[in-house]
Structures are given as structure tokens and as C-alpha cells.
């Protein structure tokens, strides 16, 4: 089976990772003791993508949990689903990274990285045909960003032909823990551009807005934000976990969504969004779901897709839905909004359907878009970065760990280049003479 190994790094990464495992265990009928008690054979058919069947009939997540301090690990371990995980797969330091990317990447994290790679290696050896890795982490702190990107580059070095997907939480001043978040995020994006194949950008600002405006939560907690994220992660991975034709593995997903290797940062959306305990008594129709999906209020990135253009889109519908109705709806959205889709990638919207709905709703839909408007998110972080970097504020925390200032300048310029590339493709038309880019190989050379 095409296995995926999940790595959670840092506080945020472990919190959304734990919420993800709890959600998908529920969908696959795995109880907190790791025993299958489901009723639908579809739950078992591709279970081995994410779970390893242990000798005692238990299904153990292919998960590695990493942090530079023990607090969150203890919380995960003592949580409802804490016994699901293999105890050896919790790896933690004691000192923490103090929200400092350099500590995670070069000092504290570097000391722990070999023991993490040993566990990753063991999980890879337990796989018949490993398709790749998925990392959950945040870009604003020290461990998830610094050590998370260190792990990504080390895993990439050792498994260069496997897919690398990341669920990356982008910081926002609205939900800020620390003043140096723009530094940590920019240094991380610099790494993700080079070492990840697909990055699902989860933007704290957008999560916060959804909680306040759509879910009507006055003071959203981290648990509320994590609940949203786990729903989206469950939706994105539906095609990987249940039988289906389209985007059934990480590589096929990337082939459909990534037109140029550096442009692999996706906006994600989810519908229906309803407050806990407010599940509506009326099921949404396919047209309503589709409309919600394309609404910027349902996007987990605080960028408005109407300010850019879609390069590619994948939508996943779950539940008892008619394939024809879904395809008609998606086509009609495209026809009504053709200005927002680049015309030089024909058939750039793809739809998949899975008959297993998520728990508690009859139908749901998840949306993954490679939209040029994601540049707004990078610009937001970049502006905050340059405001501090121009004054060399807080840099001593990084240089004291042995970092060189040139690395900051390189990261800033790589992220600025990414923004310009998105802009360039946003403006491109079918007839552009300069659409032949020297650095893109012809397809047959790449395969």
C-alpha cells in the first residue's frame, strides 16, 4: 500500500496533528485503544496508508511526534487518543526553542534531529511502498519552523524521490504569540520553496476571522482553531485514505496542482462551516456547498482569490452526492467567473467524490486552490519582516546561535521572488511570447 508518514513538529504542529489523528480515527472506525470498530468496508480498504497494523490487531498511526519541550507531548499522550501512538515515536528535548528559528534549526533542534530520523527510518522500513511524508508545523515559533524545516531538508536528502507535503500554519499579528514571527516565517518559507512538493497554507488570521464571523465565537481558543484545521486536513487527505479515482496519492495531487515547481503553496477551504452544536438541521445542497467553497470567507488563507487568478483547483465532495450535479455546478462556477481562472491551463479544475461523509454532517466539500492571490499572505509577512530587518531588530537572538545575517537577506529575497513569480503568471495570457520560461524543462525531460 502507498504509505504516508506523518511528522508533527513543535507545539502547534503537535496540537493540529493530534486533532487530525482524532478526526481521521473517528472516520475510519478506530477507537482510542487503536481497535477497529467500524461497520463500513470502505473504512478499512486503504487504512494502511496512515496506519500500521500491529500484531495484536491494533492499528497504530504512522506518526512521529517531535518537540523541543515536553509539555504538549504530555498533553497529547494523556489526551483521549494518546494511547493510539507508538510510545517510542514521541521524541522531545527539555530546553525549548524559545520562539527562535535558529535554535530549532541550528542548535537545540540539530542535536535532536538524528534520533528523529532514526524513528522516521524505522517507520519507512515498516512500509511496503512509501509514497511520502506529511509534516504539520507552524512557521511562527521556533521548533515547528526551525526544526520542522531542518527535518524536511534531512528527510528530503535521505528520500529524494518521495513526496513531501506540509501543513504549514502561517502567523498573523491577530493571533500572535511572539514579536519575531515574521523572521521565523520568512526563514521557513525560504526552506519550503526549495524542499517541499506541496504546502497547504493555513493562515491563523483567516482561522481567527472564520471563528469570529462565521462561527460567531467571541474569543476563539486554540482548540477552536485546531478543530477547523483538522476538518480541512481530513478533507484534503480524503482522496488518499478512501478509494477513489482522482488525486489518489500525493504525487497525483501535485501533478494536477503544481504547474511550476516553486509555485506549490495552496489555499484551502472547507464547507459547511457551522459552529459547534449549531449543525443545521437542513442538509446543504451541492450548489450551496460549491458556492461556499469559492467564497473567500471560507478560505483558510487571509487572501481574497478575487484579487488574483486560479492556476489550478481541486475540489473534494464527500457524502451521498451526484457526480453529475457536482460536475455541472463546478463547470457553472468556472463559466460565471472565467476571468478568475488562467486560460492557458485548460481543464484546471478537478473534482473528486468520496461516499464516506465526515462525522456529524451528511455532506461536505474541501477546496484546494493554487491561486496567485496567495502572494498577499507572503507580502504581509514580508512587510513585517523588512520593517524589523531594516533596523536589525532582535537579530542578536539569531546571530548568538551562530546564524549569519546573509541568511536573512537570502530568505527575504527568495520570498520576494516567489511573490513576483505569482504576479508574473497572474498577468500572463495565452498569447504571451515570454510564456516559454528558460528554467522550465520540457515535460518529457522531467518525467
Swiss-Prot record:
Q: Name one GO cellular component term.
A: cytoplasm
The lineage's top-level taxon is Eukaryota
Q: Which residues bind GTP?
A: 11, 69, 138, 142-144, 204, 226
Gene Ontology terms, MF aspect: GTP binding; GTPase activity; metal ion binding; structural constituent of cytoskeleton
State the Pfam families in the record.
Tubulin, Tubulin_C
Q: What is its main location?
A: cytoplasm
GO biological process, alphabetically ordered: microtubule-based process
UniProt key word DNA damage: no
| Co-factor(s) | Mg(2+)
Q: Where does Mg(2+) bind?
A: 69
Q: Which UniProt keywords apply?
A: Cytoplasm, Cytoskeleton, GTP-binding, Magnesium, Metal-binding, Microtubule, Nucleotide-binding
Q: Where in the cell is the protein located?
A: Cytoplasm, Cytoskeleton
InterPro entries noted in UniProt: Beta-tubulin_BS, Beta_tubulin, Tub_FtsZ_C, Tubulin, Tubulin/FtsZ-like_C, Tubulin/FtsZ_2-layer-sand-dom, Tubulin/FtsZ_GTPase_sf, Tubulin_C
UniProt cross-references to PROSITE patterns, sorted A to Z? TUBULIN, TUBULIN_B_AUTOREG
Cross-referenced PANTHER family: TUBULIN (PTHR11588)
> What protein family does this chain belong to?
Belongs to the tubulin family.
Its subunit composition reads:
Dimer of alpha and beta chains. A typical microtubule is a hollow water-filled tube with an outer diameter of 25 nm and an inner diameter of 15 nM. Alpha-beta heterodimers associate head-to-tail to form protofilaments running lengthwise along the microtubule wall with the beta-tubulin subunit facing the microtubule plus end conferring a structural polarity. Microtubules usually have 13 protofilaments but different protofilament numbers can be found in some organisms and specialized cells.
Entry function: Tubulin is the major constituent of microtubules, a cylinder consisting of laterally associated linear protofilaments composed of alpha- and beta-tubulin heterodimers. Microtubules grow by the addition of GTP-tubulin dimers to the microtubule end, where a stabilizing cap forms. Below the cap, tubulin dimers are in GDP-bound state, owing to GTPase activity of alpha-tubulin.
What is the protein name stated in its UniProt record? Tubulin beta-1 chain
Originating organism: Geotrichum candidum (Oospora lactis)
Amino acid at each position: 500500500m502507498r504509505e504516508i508518514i506523518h511528522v508533527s513538529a513543535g507545539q502547534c504542529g503537535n496540537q493540529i496533528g493530534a486533532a487530525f489523528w482524532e478526526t481521521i480515527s473517528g472516520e475510519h472506525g478506530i477507537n482510542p485503544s487503536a481497535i477497529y470498530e467500524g461497520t463500513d468496508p470502505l473504512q478499512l480498504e486503504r487504512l494502511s496508508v496512515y496506519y500500521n497494523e500491529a500484531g495484536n490487531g491494533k492499528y497504530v498511526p504512522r506518526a512521529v511526534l517531535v518537540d523541543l519541550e515536553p509539555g504538549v507531548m504530555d498533553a497529547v499522550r494523556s489526551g483521549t487518543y494518546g494511547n493510539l501512538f507508538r510510545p517510542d515515536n514521541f521524541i522531545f528535548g527539555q530546553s525549548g526553542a524559545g520562539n527562535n528559528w535558529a535554535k530549532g534549526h541550528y542548535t537545540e533542534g540539530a542535536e535532536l534531529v538524528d534520533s528523529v530520523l532514526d524513528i522516521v527510518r524505522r517507520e519507512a522500513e515498516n512500509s511496503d511502498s512509501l509514497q511520502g511524508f506529511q509534516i504539520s508545523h507552524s512557521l511562527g515559533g521556533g521548533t515547528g519552523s526551525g526544526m520542522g524545516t531542518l527535518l524536511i531538508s534531512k528527510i528530503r536528502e535521505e528520500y529524494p524521490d518521495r513526496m513531501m507535503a506540509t501543513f504549514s500554519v502561517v502567523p498573523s499579528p491577530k493571533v500572535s504569540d511572539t514579536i519575531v514571527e515574521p523572521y521565523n516565517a520568512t526563514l521557513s518559507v525560504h526552506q519550503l520553496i526549495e524542499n517541499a512538493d506541496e504546502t497547504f497554507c493555513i493562515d491563523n488570521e483567516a482561522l481567527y476571522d472564520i471563528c469570529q464571523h462565521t462561527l460567531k465565537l467571541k474569543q476563539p481558543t486554540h482548540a477552536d482553531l485546531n478543530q477547523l484545521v483538522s476538518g480541512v486536513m481530513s478533507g484534503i487527505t480524503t482522496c488518499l485514505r478512501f478509494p477513489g479515482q482522482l488525486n489518489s496519492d500525493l504525487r497525483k495531487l501535485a501533478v494536477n496542482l503544481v504547474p511550476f515547481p516553486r509555485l506549490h503553496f495552496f489555499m484551502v477551504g472547507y464547507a459547511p462551516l457551522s459552529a459547534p452544536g449549531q449543525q443545521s438541521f437542513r442538509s446543504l445542497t451541492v450548489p450551496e456547498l460549491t458556492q461556499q467553497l469559492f467564497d473567500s470567507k471560507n478560505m483558510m488563507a487571509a487572501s481574497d482569490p478575487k484579487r488574483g487568478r486560479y492556476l489550478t483547483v481541486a475540489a473534494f465532495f464527500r457524502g451521498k452526492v451526484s457526480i453529475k450535479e457536482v460536475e455541472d455546478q463546478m463547470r457553472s462556477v468556472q463559466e460565471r467567473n472565467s476571468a478568475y481562472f488562467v486560460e492557458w491551463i485548460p481543464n484546471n479544475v478537478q473534482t473528486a467524490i468520496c461516499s464516506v461523509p465526515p462525522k456529524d454532517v451528511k455532506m461536505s466539500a474541501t477546496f484546494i486552490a493554487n491561486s496567485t492571490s496567495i502572494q498577499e499572505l507572503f507580502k504581509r509577512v514580508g512587510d513585517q519582516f523588512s520593517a524589523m530587518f531594516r533596523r536589525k531588530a532582535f537579530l542578536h537572538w539569531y546571530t548568538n546561535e551562530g546564524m549569519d545575517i546573509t541568511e536573512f537577506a537570502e530568505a527575504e529575497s527568495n520570498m520576494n521572488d516567489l511573490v513576483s513569480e505569482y504576479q508574473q503568471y497572474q498577468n500572463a495570457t495565452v498569447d504571451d511570447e515570454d510564456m516559454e520560461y528558460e528554467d522550465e524543462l520540457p515535460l518529457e525531460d522531467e518525467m
